């Protein structure tokens, strides 16, 4: 049996019009070939689908059942084609994004996440908070489509684009003598009790900020080690020490703490969008990348 979709469409048109001439006009074909195709369809099925007289065309019991089934099949095919097209256009599917805790504080990132969800509601956006080090392996393996992470050494198999190049800022308790200065030097910060990341956490900011200090031959006196940037902010506001974080965290404003610019011009950090170089990017991932890069312009 070799029934094609066009046979089903021909039959549905005749069954709905109950007139070969009108059905042929609807299908934009001539009537004789349409009659031949319906006869061939009946022969393949082995049942009469239409009762024909000189004056009318009626559905047989088999024809009524075949009409219902044909409509369902054609609807399923149309739905499947529409879903495939939406996936091809990046309007459906799944997008897996890793991000560091600082990424949502960057305006372009938060705006892009919001706009992407609005513009592509049928794309399942799976976000995973992971530090910089934790994202590398899933990106290489392709279990993450892309990652938002701090500048770090990347393997050759990963590509990146700079999302933001931002200053590092000092965080100082509000009643500290340095809190009201127009800026503060790294040397001044290195003399104070320092609240910082646990080295085992694997955040890119740990290497970034300590590397900056080392370039100036400074070693901060780390008195508190924690796992999250928000914990650092909380402990500084509680007066347990000073710290350094990227300027994007300035969106967190607490009365007990001041954000003070750092005097050294190279006190900067970058947020990167990273994706696998050798894995084909899904249309949804390409759309997200375009949205994010456009938000930076």
Swiss-Prot record:
Membership in a protein family: Belongs to the LysR transcriptional regulatory family.
Protein name: Uncharacterized HTH-type transcriptional regulator YnfL
Protein's UniProt keywords contain Cell division: no
Any one GO molecular-function label of the UniProt entry: DNA binding
GO BP, sorted A to Z: regulation of DNA-templated transcription
DNA-binding region: 20-40
Residue intervals of the HTH lysR-type domain: 1-60
PANTHER family (alphabetical): LYSR FAMILY TRANSCRIPTIONAL REGULATOR, TRANSCRIPTIONAL DUAL REGULATOR HCAR-RELATED
Keywords: DNA-binding, Transcription, Transcription regulation
Gene Ontology cellular component annotations, sorted alphabetically: protein-DNA complex
Superkingdom of source: Bacteria
InterPro entries: LysR_subst-bd, Tscrpt_reg_HTH_LysR, WH-like_DNA-bd_sf, WH_DNA-bd_sf
């Amino acid at each position: 049996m070799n029934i094609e979709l066009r046979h089903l469409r021909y039959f549905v048109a005749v069954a709905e019009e109950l007139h070969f001439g009108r059905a042929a006009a609807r299908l934009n074909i001539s009537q004789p070939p349409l009659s031949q195709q319906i006869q061939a369809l009946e022969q393949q099925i082995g049942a009469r689908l239409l009762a024909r007289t000189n004056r009318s065309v009626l559905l047989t019991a088999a024809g009524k059942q075949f009409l219902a089934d044909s409509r369902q099949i054609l609807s399923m095919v149309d739905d499947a084609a529409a879903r495939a097209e939406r996936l091809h256009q990046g309007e459906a599917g799944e997008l897996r994004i890793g991000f560091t805790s600082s990424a949502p504080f960057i305006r372009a990132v938060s705006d892009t996440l919001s706009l992407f969800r609005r513009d592509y509601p049928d794309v399942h956006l799976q976000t995973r908070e992971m530090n910089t080090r934790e994202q590398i392996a899933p990106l290489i393996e392709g279990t993450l489509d892309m990652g938002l992470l701090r500048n770090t050494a990347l393997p050759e198999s990963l590509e990146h684009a700079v999302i933001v190049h931002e200053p590092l800022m000092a965080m100082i308790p509000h009643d500290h003598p340095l809190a009201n200065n127009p800026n503060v030097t790294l040397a001044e910060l290195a003399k104070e009790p320092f609240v910082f990341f646990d080295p085992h956490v694997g955040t890119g900011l740990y290497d970034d900020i300590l590397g900056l200090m080392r370039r100036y031959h400074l070693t901060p006196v780390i008195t508190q080690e924690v796992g999250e940037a928000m914990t650092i902010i909380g402990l500084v506001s509680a007066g347990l020490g000073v710290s350094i974080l990227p300027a994007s965290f300035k969106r967190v404003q607490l009365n007990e703490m001041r954000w003070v610019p750092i005097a050294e011009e190279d006190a900067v950090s970058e947020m990167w969008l990273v994706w696998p170089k050798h894995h084909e990017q899904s249309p949804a991932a390409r759309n997200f990348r375009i949205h994010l890069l456009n938000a930076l312009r």
